[in-house]
């Protein structure tokens, strides 16, 4: 037994040990006349003290587990994974279940469960693992979850904070899907009525659609609704991490999934489209790698346009950096999730993000603490060139404050240099060069560079490869 399992077992035994302590306390009270008159401790005080310790220990232990939570936002449907033997799977440690949560599940108290989860909800500490372990103690998990959704009249104001109870509904149904609970005919019929009621509230509200699709997925109601309509709702919730899970669970056929992917591509959402390609088993019909490579170039070009449109001001450079970094981070996640690092060795996406963040920090530092001009000492003559006596140009405060100058390498060489967005600037002190001159013809739009190119060569325009086979 690991240390973690030992701690979890000990916490779960607190109630049992507290009962033994109460029995001993009652025996002691029977001989109260023999005790000191100053002994006035009551059982309620002892019980309150131990309950407080129990809650604190359980909370800290749950927080300790949450530092490396299992990923519940990525579900694979690769058929090859299904054939792997259970012996090769990693065995996750059983999370601790607080006694109050376990008792609610054992009593099939859906309303109490909702109130409890709202009370302890913490955005920084996911509850998926603990709830998944707890609801397994329920004799009728599906009925309990349905009771929680149907009968919840718990108002956020009574908890003293603003909270969307629908988040708890989604969590419970997500866990219900995960454990593949048994669903009786009566429970399914009740869920069907609730699903139709929730469907009437969807309209154009994505989160309402998310709850509705979870009802359909968790209670196996896919055959009760029109598949085309369900597919439209999946497109509406595509941005949520559970979108591919419910899409696979509600029975949307491959043809409609393919149509959904094309719609995402046409709507300018290539990252979401690629997620559906991998997690809905559509990589045999679509080519995700060209889509991602094209996305990288589009991100670079979009950031470059932000700079050019505002004459490469400091503000535009910061906005462009933020825009590109925020666009590349979900790409990095997909590359890691799908083990695609070998496909993007030339693009060096992570290095690009680090470079952008470093350059932004440098610009901020130089703007906050601009270089000070040394006061000119009296009686000293200006330095002149030994050949023609001309004054050697000294970089002015104005030049040093220019964003282009701040982005130049510390040791510049003669000639033209590339700034982080692929535009050329002069390396000669005191000479201002139009960053677009020589790169693009008059009236031409600026062209982007590949991430791996740091030599100053500008590539000719490239046609994007097709997103999917014709």
From Swiss-Prot:
Report which superkingdom the organism of origin falls in. Answer: Eukaryota
Note the coiled coil stretches, chain numbering: 336-369
Provide this UniProt record's keywords sorted from A to Z. Answer: Coiled coil, Developmental protein, Differentiation, Flowering
Q: Name one GO biological process term.
A: cell differentiation
Instruction: Write out the tissue specificity statement of the associated record.
Output: Expressed during seed development and in dry seed. Preferentially expressed in the chalazal endosperm during early stages of seed development.
- InterPro entries per the record? Frigida (IPR012474)
Where is composition skewed (Polar residues) in this entry?
A: 388-400
Q: Any idea what a deletion of this gene does?
A: Reduced levels of FLC expression and early flowering, but not redundant with FRI. Frl1 and frl2 double mutants flower earlier than frl1 single mutant, due to a partial redundancy.
Homology family: Belongs to the Frigida family.
Binding partners and assembly? Component of the transcription activator complex FRI-C composed of FRI, FRL1, SUF4, FLX and FES1. Interacts with FRI and SUF4.
Anything else known: In cv. Columbia and cv. Landsberg erecta, either FRL1 or FRL2, but not both, is functional and required for FRI-mediated up-regulation of FLC.
Q: What does this protein do?
A: Required for FRI-mediated up-regulation of FLC transcripts, but not redundant with FRI and only partially redundant with FRL2. Required for the stabilization of the FRI-C complex.
Name the chain's protein: FRIGIDA-like protein 1
Gene that produces this protein? FRL1
